[in-house]
Design a protein with these regions (language model features):
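Electrostatic cytochrome c docking/interface patches
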Residues: 13-29, 45
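Low-complexity, intrinsically disordered/propeptide-like segments
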Residues: 8, 16-18, 73
Length: 105
């Protein structure tokens, strides 16, 4: 329980970390907002990813999800994933979803 609280606290600190240089770069936003749970390579093989059962972007079933649905999950959250709709612009969210597709390869 204590470990999950530490992970949640670190995630909360990182939520405010997107710099101006990363505003429209899907890769940069992913690295700052998503990689902690989903991993730099998209496998979700991280302590936070395991704790929160994060989706792996190497899973073909996950990647068959329509972009509109992925965008909705990023904006509104789902299960243990927090909502980022108030922290990221629509352009940033779309850029992250586009970047996630590059991790599938």
């Amino acid at each position: 329980m204590r470990g999950i609280l530490k992970v949640a606290a670190v995630c909360a600190l990182m939520l405010g970390a997107v710099g101006a240089w990363a505003q429209d770069s899907g890769e940069a936003v992913y690295k700052l907002k998503c990689a902690m749970c989903h991993g730099a390579d998209g496998t979700a093989n991280t302590p936070a990813g395991k704790a929160f059962n994060a989706a792996s972007y190497k899973d073909p079933a996950v990647m068959k999800t329509p972009d509109a649905d992925l965008i909705a999950v990023v904006k509104n959250g789902k299960n243990k994933m927090p909502a980022f709709g108030t922290m990221l612009t629509d352009a940033q969210i779309k850029a992250v979803v586009a970047y996630v597709h590059t991790l599938q390869k």
